[in-house]
Amino acid sequence: MARTNLISEVERRRRRKYMISAAFRYTLLTVVALVMIYPIIWLVGATFKTNNEIFTSINFIPSKIDFTPYVNGWKTRTKFTFTTFFINTFSFVIPKILFCLISSTLVAYGFARFNFPFKKICFSILMATMFLPSVVTRIPLYILWKNLGLLNTYVPLIAPTVFANEPFFVFMLIQFMRSIPTYLDEAATIDGCNSFGILTMILLPALKPALISCTIFQFVWSFNDFLGPLIYVTSLAKYPVSLALKMSIDQSSGIVEWNQILAMSFLALLPALILFFCCQKYFVEG
């Protein structure tokens, strides 16, 4: 009887200790989550405020819901609306994603499944480029595209992805492919599959989580890219969303409509958020 009571007491203490620890962890996580998400909450609230209310009220809840910032912000002060800017953005973001996935998968397949001369040296060079700042190559690339007469087009933004210029994605896909057993390749070879068939019918279905992760990363990076379009795109008619938002901050008139800028900034966040939440399951797996 005494032994049973002792075990029960130990169990109660253990359970109490676990509950206190869990309460502390969840409280800490909740506080951190609120701190991280507060800027987004404030951004959403500020899109419905007037300029004066944005700078005079610390409350993120607007005094009244007003969609005027969204309407006027979408129209802009030019002859182009944000419809044009979003179309421009997707017109080079989507090709970048497709070419990046194709080229990165092919390069990763070569490194993960084939042996060839100087393989380790080539892989080392590939990994070394991960530590090379992209700004280092801006001037040489600008001169190249200028000599080719391709400035003020989206070609300088899209073309590098054809040649697997994202070593991070290549490295991630290589590691994912190495986790797939090679006996699947051998079985497919016995059944008459060639190398391309093994890639398309065996490896690609297994690579789905990794490919979706690459898609999310590339979409966010390309959609938010400011420096690339700023260097290569000069025509207002071809501006992406990132440049259009900067254009909206017009100091020449003396008045900056921050509520409109924040409204368009929130709309610019939505595509990436929607993509992430739709593919969250595969992103975690990848």
Explain the meaning of each model-derived region.
Residues 4, 13-17, 21-286:
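A structural signal for multi-pass alpha-helical bundles of membrane permease subunits
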Residues 9-10:
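Membrane-interfacial, low-structure loops and terminal tails that flank and connect transmembrane helices
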